[in-house]
Amino acid sequence: MALRALGRAFPARIGHRSVRGFASSSTEPTLRTALFFPGHGVQRKGMTRDWVEAFPQTCKPFLEEMDDLLQTKLSTLIEEGPIYILDKTENAQPAIMAVSIMILKVLEQEFGFRTEESINVTLGHSLGEYAALVAAGYLTYPFALNLVRQRGEIMGECTRKAKEESGDRFGMMALVCEPDQLDSLVAAVKDFLSHGAEGSKDDSSHSQAIEQVSIANANSKNQIVLSGSFTRIRNLLVHIREFGGHDPRAVELKSNSAFHSPIMQPAYEYMRKVLVPSQVSFPAKMPTISNVTARPFQSKEDLINGLSRQAIDTVLWWDSIKYLDREAGCTRWLGVGPGKVGRNLVSKEVGRSGAKGGGVWSISDPDDIEPTLKGLEQTAHEAAS
């Protein structure tokens, strides 16, 4: 197959690692090619079907291994649904992470894609951080898969308890505004949440976790995501529209839990307990960007702390993209996993599709492979010429 030959011929990376213990280059970009993974909300029924049909030798054993590791037929749930069961946090999150790694395995095993040679840095949006750490070699796939499953069960229980105690719905809502209004919108939100106190959380000691709202994600130059009680979120929107001079477009997200908010404290505590140094390899094959610092993890303890805090802290996605784009010299961006949300967020920020030696690609179904590998090969040659 000509496409497989193209994959095997894929050139080695251009540029050198430059993050603590990695050699740097003064003449070439240091983190030129980024591999990124999607987060919660991209799950859909049947999202493995085309992959199994196109690449049964790789995908069938991979999905069987997933079921064995989790001791449940998650592959059947992904294929057949029902979707309301797949959407449960404890199912959606391991499904998304596993499918993301499966697609990467297809590239490696069917097309000879050499991740360690072709990629300089990995990152993932929220849940996607786990796939990024697996791809870079910090966590093993079996450990990460079970970790995500258990974490998802705890997160689901956190939300159920909050609903029972308050009688309210919990979830996440994106606020979209003009780029030049984002800073003042964030300031207005923070002022409402914490009465001017520094930070994105409502830090009032008199407010229970279920009454709090957090800025869960800073996604782009014109979008943040709020997480928590929908009643409290609606009150916040009324306040900033009446008194803050803002009227952002509000979009409820495909999430039945308030991720990255104080109600997820039990998930943070679980992560701190089970994510021990012996389960983390450091250094690994390449840097991975932390969601909570928007910089590469610097040590085992930094990784353990950052990955644990991710459950309750803001995901600094926009800052991560800006760091790689403006400071680390990243010009090529490869998204791997279900859905196109991650690619759209990256494309909106870096706008590199037409730049010589740069571009943004994503692989979410088999038809994406050929144009992606060709684009990566072409831009590697352009940069070398």
Segments predicted by a language model, with ranges:
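Acyltransferase
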Residues: 246-336, 340-347, 351-370, 379-385
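N-terminal chloroplast transit peptides
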Residues: 1-18
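A generic secondary-structure signal
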Residues: 106-110, 239, 323, 327
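FabD-like malonyl-/acyl-CoA
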Residues: 20-198, 332-385
